[in-house]
Structure formats: C-alpha cells, structure tokens
Amino acid sequence: MSEKPTLNIVLVEPRIPQNTGNVARTCACTACRLHLVGPMGFAIDDKKLKHAGLDYWHYLDISYYDGLDDFFAKNSGPYYYFTTKAPQRYTDVTYPDGAYLVFGREDAGLPEALLAANQEHCIRMPMRDTCRSLNLSNSVAVGVYEVLRQWDFPELLDHGHLRDYQWK
C-alpha cells in the first residue's frame, strides 16, 4: 500500500470503562480511529477510562455517536462484525483500506438483528466451547493486529531499543 491505510474500530454500547480505555490505548498505538457508539455504561470522563488509556489520549482520533443509526448515517463501511456466533474466522477475511471492525457490548455482543442482516460480514475468533467470549479489549487487539499484519504494519515501528544494552 503506497499511502497509509485507515482502520476503524467501533465499540457498540461499551459497559466497562477499563476495556474502552485499553482499546483507546491500542488505537492510539496503532493509529486506528476509534468510534464509540452509545449509550455507554460510563461517563467519558471516568477516571478508570482515562487511567486505562494512560497518557495516550492526545494521540487518539475518536468519534462519538448517540446510537447505531447515528453511526451508520455518518460512516459508509465496509463493516466486519465480530461475534461469537459467526461461522467465518477473522483470519479468513482480506480487509480493505477503510475497514470498520465492529464489536458489541461486553455482556451481550452485537444485536442479533444486525448480525442476521449482515451474515457475510460476521466473523469470529476460535475459542473453546466451554467459554462465552474473550475480553473485549483483547478481541479488539487481536483483530487490529491481524489487519495490520495483512497490511504489513504500515508506519509502525518494527524494532525497539534496549535502555542499557545494544542488540547484536
């Protein structure tokens, strides 16, 4: 890709501020846009939210929406809906520039009517059948890094530096 592609992360009705803060930090570190769709289970100035995101908030490109209708009216997709119910794996998809990875609330996921209307774009992360779901912020991180891997990690550092030693 010649220009840096855009990846969008969408949280629909998040309930737990620490999860949203962790997702915000992931978005800041990977240059993803974050879209928060209400109603949310916390105030945006919640201390737990800010603490989980550390001091990365100024790196964040974030938008807020009153609900799904507001979000869809302002964004054109393509959308990929992460759900525990889908038959297609997240690694079986080739993600285009401008993709929106959409995640539901921690306690309920995405509305089933939305999933049923968009079956071809519903994807899942494989896991044991004895567990309900992965943590929201972990799921977002896995999804983000799969897309960035496919895009060859555009404009992200691929090496680090030791503080007191040199790599050989």
Task: Walk through the language-model features, giving the residues of each.
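Post-transcriptional modification and biogenesis factors for structured RNAs
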Residues: M1-K168
